Amino acid sequence: MIKDILNKSEEKMLKSISVLKKDLGSMKAGKANPAMLDRVNVEYYGSETPINQLANVSSPEPRVLLIQPWDKNSLKDIEKAILQSDLGLNPSNDGSVIRLIIPELTEETRKDIVKKVKKIGEESKIAIRSIRREGNDKIKNLKKNNDITEDEAKEGESSVQKITDKYITEIDNIVSAKEKEVMSV
């Protein structure tokens, strides 16, 4: 029973880590990265569609993203979605492809990005702690119903805490690596 709780808690924590990595991967750090556009959805034939399902996104140069839509009619929609996103990029549409030039980051912009990175990291830690609380509550319920002993409950809570500590440390490492990436000129 406790093993199931631990496995489910760890599985949820892993999902939180992958969401963190995806969110941080989509943040610009002065280099073009196709993942930057992962969270941009295009209004296409009445439904919200991710750009990577409408076009090939590549990075031919370190600071350029090239978007080649499979349907040329979607160029305007893609351009509009990029302009409305919070990326702060200006698309250049030549009628067949869209080019995004990633501007050099100023010191101030870098610091703003680092603040966002820390905020996203903190949100991930909150999610991990919430999963810990959920796991501990389930263990306490098992003890309350006399399904497990006091010692098993304490051991289970200790195991949940160890898993939590492991993923909090991983979040700290991911966030500090992203900060270094953003601050390196």
UniProtKB/Swiss-Prot annotation:
UniProt xrefs under InterPro entries: Ribosome_recyc_fac, Ribosome_recyc_fac_dom, RRF_sf
UniProtKB keywords: Cytoplasm, Protein biosynthesis
Subcellular location, record wording: Cytoplasm
Record GO biological process: translational termination
GO molecular function per UniProt: ribosomal large subunit binding
Primary localisation category: cytoplasm
Domain of life (superkingdom): Bacteria
A GO cellular-component term linked to this record: cytoplasm
Keyword Cytoplasm appears in the UniProt entry: yes
Homology family: Belongs to the RRF family.
Entry function: Responsible for the release of ribosomes from messenger RNA at the termination of protein biosynthesis. May increase the efficiency of translation by recycling ribosomes from one round of translation to another.
Protein name per UniProt: Ribosome-recycling factor
Organism in which the protein naturally occurs: Clostridium novyi (strain NT)
